[in-house]
Amino acid sequence: MTEQADAAMPIQFTDAAAAKVKGLLEEEQNPALKLRVYVTGGGCSGFQYGFTFDEKVNEGDFTVEKQGVQLVVDPMSLQYLVGGEVDYTSGLEGSRFFVKNPNATTTCGCGASFSV
């Protein structure tokens, strides 16, 4: 996919996140799994991000494919994530998937919850 096409996507999926998902799927030996990102009420700032693996893509879900793996977002969550980017980091504090969300007006210290 070209950079211009990537820029038109409502949510981005970084190379680091895609590579980690690919590695996890190889460990699980289940290539049908997809990384599902969702937003739920809760956390110290009002909303929180969730990540899970799912074999299904439901009607209305938005998908992004990179490096042969898929990121899936339900339509309700997507409205809070438009313009965002799902990334993966590994460091002294641990390893995790996270969302860079331009719609978040405040976030908590750990970055797991936000408000709009």
Curated annotation (Swiss-Prot):
PROSITE patterns: HESB. Binds 1 iron-sulfur cluster per subunit. Keywords: Iron, Iron-sulfur, Metal-binding. It comes from the Bacteria. GO terms for biological process: iron-sulfur cluster assembly. Gene3D superfamilies: HesB-like domain (2.60.300.12). InterPro entries: FeS_biogenesis, FeS_cluster_insertion, FeS_cluster_insertion_CS, FeS_cluster_insertion_RrpA, HesB-like_dom_sf. The keyword Hydrolase does not apply. Its cofactor is iron-sulfur cluster. GO terms for cellular component: cytosol. GO terms for molecular function: 2 iron, 2 sulfur cluster binding; 4 iron, 4 sulfur cluster binding; iron ion binding. Iron-sulfur cluster binds at residues 44, 108, 110. Required for insertion of 4Fe-4S clusters for at least IspG. Belongs to the HesB/IscA family. Homodimer. HAMAP family: Fe_S_insert_ErpA. PANTHER family: IRON-SULFUR CLUSTER ASSEMBLY 2 HOMOLOG, MITOCHONDRIAL (PTHR43011:SF1). This is Iron-sulfur cluster insertion protein ErpA. It comes from Shewanella sp. (strain W3-18-1).
